[in-house]
Amino acid sequence: MAGHSKWANIKHRKAAQDAQRGKIFTKLIRELVTAAKIGGGDVAANPRLRSAVDKALSSNMTRDTINRAIERGVGGGDDTNMETKIYEGYGPGGTAVMVECLSDNANRTISQVRPSFTKCGGNLGTEGSVGYLFSKKGLILIANADEDALTEAAIEAGADDIQAQEDGSFEIYTAWEDLGSVRDGIEAAGFNIQEAEVTMIPSTTVDLDAETAPKLLKLIDMLEDCDDVQNVYHNGEISDEVAALL
C-alpha cells in the first residue's frame, strides 16, 4: 500500500467483495440500467456505460445479463427511476469520504449512510464539505509494461499523466470524458489493460496509523454493504508498515 496508489489501497478488500457477489451483481445491474437510461445504449458513445460494462465483465457477469440490463435502461423499465446522489463526510483520522449512491428513495439511503459514519467515529457532512478535495478522473491500470513505450502510447492517446508504481504496474490518468478514447488508443498500441474506470482522485491524502486505519476500513465495509451505495471514495493512506499490523 505504498505511495498514493488508488489501486493499492483497495487490493486488500477484493476477497471480501468477492464474497458478496450477489449484492455486487445487483449494484452492477443498477448502474448498467441507469447509465443506459441517461446516455443511451451505445457503449462506444457512453463512457459511463462502458465503465459499467467493464466492471460487470470483470466480475464475471454474463454478456446476456449485461445486455438485458442495458435494454431495460434504454426501454425505460420499472427500475430506471434511480437517481445518483453523492454524500460527503468525515471518517476516522480526519479522512474525507465521498459516498456515491444510486437510489429511488433518498430517505432510505440516508438512513443507511448516516449510521455508518456515526458508528465508526465519523460524521456525515454537508454538500461541498469535502468534495473540493477530489477530482473526477479516468483511471487505467496496466499490470506490467515497458515504461517508455507505454508512456509514448499514453501521451499519443491523450492521457493526462502516467505514474509508475512500486509493484511494477502503471496508473494512467485521463479526463473522465476521455477515458474510452484513451483506453482504445492504449489497447490499439498493444497493451493489456487490467482495469479502467471513472473515479474520484483526492488532491491530498491523510496518513493513517494502526489505530485509525482499521476504523476507516470498517467504515468503507459498512458503507459498501448498504444496498444503495455504489462507490466509496476517500483520501486515507495506509502504508505498508501499518498494513502489516492489521
Curated annotation (Swiss-Prot):
Gene Ontology, cellular component aspect: cytosol
Superkingdom as given in the UniProt entry: Bacteria
Pfam families: TACO1_YebC_N, Transcrip_reg
InterPro entries reported for this sequence: Integrase-like_N, TACO1_YebC-like_2nd/3rd_dom, TACO1_YebC_N, Transcrip_reg_TACO1-like, Transcrip_reg_TACO1-like_dom3, YebC-like
Keywords from the UniProt entry: Cytoplasm, DNA-binding, Transcription, Transcription regulation
Example of a GO biological process term: regulation of DNA-templated transcription
Places the protein is found: Cytoplasm
GO molecular function: DNA binding
Main subcellular localisation: cytoplasm
Family stated for the protein in its record: Belongs to the TACO1 family.
NCBIfam families in the cross-refs: PRK00110.1 (NF001030), PRK12378.1 (NF009044), YebC/PmpR family DNA-binding transcriptional regulator (TIGR01033)
Protein name: Probable transcriptional regulatory protein HD_0596
